[in-house]
């Protein structure tokens, strides 16, 4: 682990919190599509 994992997790959380995922194709959440939520 070179430290990027923490940044990725933070980015994912931030994206999900903003509800900014566009059907699991958002570049910041593509690694965890199961948690990706589309914008309403």
Swiss-Prot record:
GO cellular component, one term: extracellular region
Keyword terms, alphabetized: Disulfide bond, Ion channel impairing toxin, Neurotoxin, Secreted, Toxin
Keyword Secreted: yes
One function term, GO molecular function aspect: toxin activity
Keyword ATP-binding in annotation: no
InterPro entries associated with the record: Conotoxin_a-typ
Regions crossing the membrane: none
Main localization category: secreted
Localization per record: Secreted
Expression tissues: Expressed by the venom duct.
Cysteine pairs bridged by disulfides in the record: 21-36, 24-29
Prosegment residue ranges: 1-18
Recorded family membership: Belongs to the conotoxin A superfamily.
Role this protein plays: Probable neurotoxin with unknown target. Possibly targets ion channels.
Free-text comment about domains: The cysteine framework is XIV (C-C-C-C).
Listed name of the protein: Conotoxin Bt14.16
Organism: Conus betulinus (Beech cone)
């Amino acid at each position: 682990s070179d430290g990027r994992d923490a940044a990725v997790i933070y980015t994912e959380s931030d994206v999900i919190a903003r509800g900014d995922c566009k059907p699991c194709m958002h570049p910041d959440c593509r690694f965890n599509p199961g948690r990706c939520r589309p914008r309403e």
